[in-house]
């Protein structure tokens, strides 16, 4: 028996709403930290799920650190985050597997249209979890002839692009406000699990 848990997460929208919804359905608590500039509508949608929600005066990556620190200080506190770092990889891997379901559904829809293999796959990236899941799925689906993968980031939060440009296999971090109109992509630190996939399989 796990007892009463408190789920901690950082988000600027959909992920936090999902965590709050799941916590509510499971009879648990949720604490959601949103970065500076998050929309009031998204805040209210998360709050409607019963979560304790705050909009902080820091960027997304700092909100992730805040959520992790608070979880560590809370009895039965659990970080539910879709980005991974050293020592925190299991839950992000589960979330990426969930994202892979969308890739599977897309592949099935393509087959229904008699398109057996896409030539190119375009996917957006924040920390890279969704992108890593999509690239990983299609790479495994077509191991001998995978599509060309193109990942798009917000210009002000281009951590994956900078890592690719460096060419040494190491991830790069972008700091600051990460100001962009692309809600959900204002992330300056890549998921280490997805980085290992993307750096080996993405064309652009």
Put a short name on every predicted segment:
Residues 73, 77-82, 93:
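Structural signature of the thiamine diphosphate
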Residues 30, 53, 78-79, 149:
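Hydrophobic beta-strand scaffold residues
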Residues 13:
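Conserved catalytic/binding loops enriched for acidic/polar residues
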Residues 5-6, 78, 120:
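Structural motif
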Residues 2-8, 17-72, 159-173, 194:
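Active-site-proximal loop->helix
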Residues 16-17, 132:
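Residues forming the Rossmann-fold NAD(P)(H) cofactor-binding site
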Residues 61, 66, 85-201:
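Glycine-rich phosphate/pyrophosphate-binding loop at beta-loop-alpha junctions
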Residues 33, 56, 82, 152-154:
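Generic beta-sheet signal
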């Amino acid at each position: 028996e796990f007892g009463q848990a408190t789920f901690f997460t950082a988000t600027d929208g959909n992920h936090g709403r999902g965590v709050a919804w799941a916590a509510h359905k499971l009879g648990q608590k949720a604490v959601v930290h949103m970065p500076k500039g998050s929309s009031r509508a998204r805040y209210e949608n998360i709050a409607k799920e019963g979560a304790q929600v705050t909009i902080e005066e820091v960027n997304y990556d700092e909100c992730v650190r805040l959520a992790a620190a608070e979880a560590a200080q809370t009895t039965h506190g659990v970080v539910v985050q879709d980005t991974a770092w050293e020592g925190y990889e299991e839950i992000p891997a589960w979330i990426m597997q969930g994202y892979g379901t969308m890739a599977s559904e897309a592949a099935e829809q393509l087959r229904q249209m008699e398109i057996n293999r896409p030539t190119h796959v375009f996917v957006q990236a924040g920390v890279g979890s969704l992108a890593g899941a999509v690239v990983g799925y299609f790479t495994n689906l077509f191991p001998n002839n995978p599509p060309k993968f193109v990942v798009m980031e917000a210009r002000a939060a281009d951590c994956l692009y900078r890592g690719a440009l460096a060419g040494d296999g190491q991830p790069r971090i972008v700091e600051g406000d990460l100001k962009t109109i692309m809600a959900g992509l204002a992330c300056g630190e890549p998921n280490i699990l997805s980085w290992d996939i993307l750096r080996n399989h993405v064309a652009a």
